[in-house]
Amino acid sequence: INSYKPLVIRFSGGPQAGHRVVYKGKSHVCSSWGSGVLLGVPTCLYKEVFIDPICIYNEYKVLVSEGIEVPKLYINPNCRVITPYDVLADSMDGRVKYNGTCGKGIHACFKRNKDNVTYSARMCPYADEYADVALQTVRDYHNLEKNIELENLFKEACTFIKEHTQTFIIGTYY
């Protein structure tokens, strides 16, 4: 009996990834899932990966619309979460073309976390309870105006992660 169970592990980076995979006539550009997505291979996101719940939600919808059976996505609870306000801050930063950021919120999220204004993946399942305060904290950190549409989309994406994908691994051993 073969007990081989493949798993793609992403150990760093974030949704700026854009690796294209092709298998049996199907093609997909991955940003959250790993390169085994078309083969049904689950992806594990290590604690150093930046996640954007909205990107995960949107990529899932694209995979489903392409008729792909979406494999599991395991997310370390310590992954740093990119909020819509991080994305806005990145895109508004006049140094975007000089600091190497791609405008996906990773640079702003990194800087925010470095300043101890954190939002980790372990909070996503509790978005109903904590998202308003967390988003206000991030919004204030970046000195941005409230955007209800983006906040609602963020909460919807966090709820999707919690209820539909059952992606969280409890524990921090990886």
Q: Language-model segments: which ranges?
A:
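Non-transmembrane, aqueous-exposed alpha-helical and coiled segments at domain scale
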Residues: 1-174
